[in-house]
Amino acid sequence: VDGDTGYGEALNVMHMVRVFEEAGAGAVQIEDQLLPKKCGHLNDKKLADAHDMAAKVAAAAKARRHLYVIARTDAAASEGIDGAVARAKLYLEAGADAIFPEALTTAEMFREFARRMPGVPLLANMTEFGRTPFFTASEFEAMGYRMVIWPVSSLRVANKAQEKLYAALARDGGTHAMVDQMQTRVELYKTIGLADYEALDASIVATIAPEGMPQRERSA
């Protein structure tokens, strides 16, 4: 789960961790930007004090029961690899399980960061139209990264499909030209697991409310 900047200070971070755990999350990432934050691939990002961020990481580590805590740093753009590595080490000391160096711009930067963080689980962000070149999962693995996210890819594909749909609707007055690009009703129901919900619904016993006032009848 993307925990943004933790939604506040240490106590807010602790609350966030418990809420995410109760919702079933297995991991959360927290970043070191200041509000109002920006996409990691934009310019003029403002960073939190490294020790303030470390305090948030420590709060997350203290509050969690099992949640995996990933500390993200956006420092490479303004403080270089040296700054990003220094922050990452501080966050690890505070209790982070893994490090996410955001918006590295070359394979050399990815390799150098990994070289200077031996044995540390690292996460890479592969977002299209950003500052990071295209790399595959296996290429990231070869550079020393155990985890990769594609956080906006499905949204971009879905938005493009919606643009095409509404353009066709405006042009044709109907959706007939787009039917072959849609899920069928059967495919949709399979995707959302409708049969499982129907079975669950059928298995629930109807509630039977007591009639009258049985306590009063027994006392009589």
Where are these regions (language model features)?
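Alpha/beta enzyme core
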Residues: 1-150, 156-167, 197, 204-218
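Flexible C-terminal active-site loop/helix
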Residues: 169-220
